[in-house]
Amino acid sequence: MVTERQNEILNLIIDIFTKTHEPVGSKALQDSINSSSATIRNDMAALEKQGLLEKAHTSSGRKPSVAGFQYFVKHSLSFDRLAENELYEVIKAFDHEFFNLEDILQQAADLLAKLSGCTVVALDVEPSRQRLTAFDIVVLSQHTALAVFTLDESNTITSQFMIPRNFLREDLDRLKALVQERFLGQTVLDIHYKIRTEIPQIIQRYFTTTDNVIHLFEHIFGDIFKENVIVSGKVGLLNFSDLKAYQFFDDSQKVAFEIRDSLAEDQMQSVRVADSRESCLSDLTIISSKFLIPYRGFGILAVIGPVNLDYQRVVSQVNVINRVLTMKLTDFYRYLSSNHYEVH
């Protein structure tokens, strides 16, 4: 069992070590701990025996172990602090007009990567929860067309496709009518289910020749089932991890699954220390935090860094960016839902 004084010593060692990355001796703690050097050494020995501290090879001092960082996160980390000293920089970074959601999320990820020195991932609302609110087909040439999807009245996705040889122009109109009749207002998850169950049963009502229609559906709808993953500071991974971790972030769908897996449905924040099931991330820390996207749901900001990062500083940075990001998104979606021509 960790005593109150031992917990104070562990917290202080973590604070010093994450700033200096040097082993900490008892003398460095005496100014902050109201105990003798011998007492502090005994407590450090007790913490080492419990696996929360470990010896350094090049010094007589001690450094936190992985278990020590995990204990700190569970018992001492404050999740509601704001990095007030960086608030002005964050507000200034968002103080201009954005033209789409992706640019706003990219700005948040870039800024957090810059402030934290870590790799950052930003995710939109989970695709399966988004609703199809508009659909159109634009003919590009004699043989190609573009399917245009609008999700949640704000997120536009396009899918270019080759018009099947047996398709007439009227068939494209029928395809558009079928989607608008059956899918508008439905969640992406429901659409995914209907393409596999309902659509094969009813396409003969719309098409005289049904060859390739199901394959065409699967092709043009494929992109709306995929996560839009924004990654910033990826090269920084190589400062504290290896090439396998770097390459992991090339697979955006695996990245999205890993980040979403780090947060339970009812969790707003999570800090996982060396706890990933992905072997290439198993010695890293993942700090995840949900942020509100008005009218639509929650996105996620995640920081991927070394185990020995300054947890309190990074969590505070995530909090302040989340707060300013939510304010910016509120303005953005308020504008989208307003009359464009109204006088302000």
From Swiss-Prot:
GO biological process terms on file: negative regulation of DNA-templated transcription
One protein family per Pfam: HrcA
Domain of life: Bacteria
UniProt entry keywords in alphabetical sequence: Repressor, Stress response, Transcription, Transcription regulation
Molecular function GO terms recorded: DNA binding
InterPro entries xref list: GAF-like_dom_sf, HrcA, HrcA_C, WH-like_DNA-bd_sf, WH_DNA-bd_sf, WHTH_HrcA_DNA-bd, WHTH_transcript_rep_HrcA_IDD
Coiled-coil regions, chain positions: none
NCBIfam families the UniProt entry points to: hrcA
Family: Belongs to the HrcA family.
Functional description taken from the UniProt entry: Negative regulator of class I heat shock genes (grpE-dnaK-dnaJ and groELS operons). Prevents heat-shock induction of these operons.
Official protein name in the record: Heat-inducible transcription repressor HrcA
Protein source organism: Streptococcus gordonii (strain Challis / ATCC 35105 / BCRC 15272 / CH1 / DL1 / V288)
Upper taxonomic lineage: Bacteria, Bacillati, Bacillota, Bacilli, Lactobacillales
Gene designation: hrcA
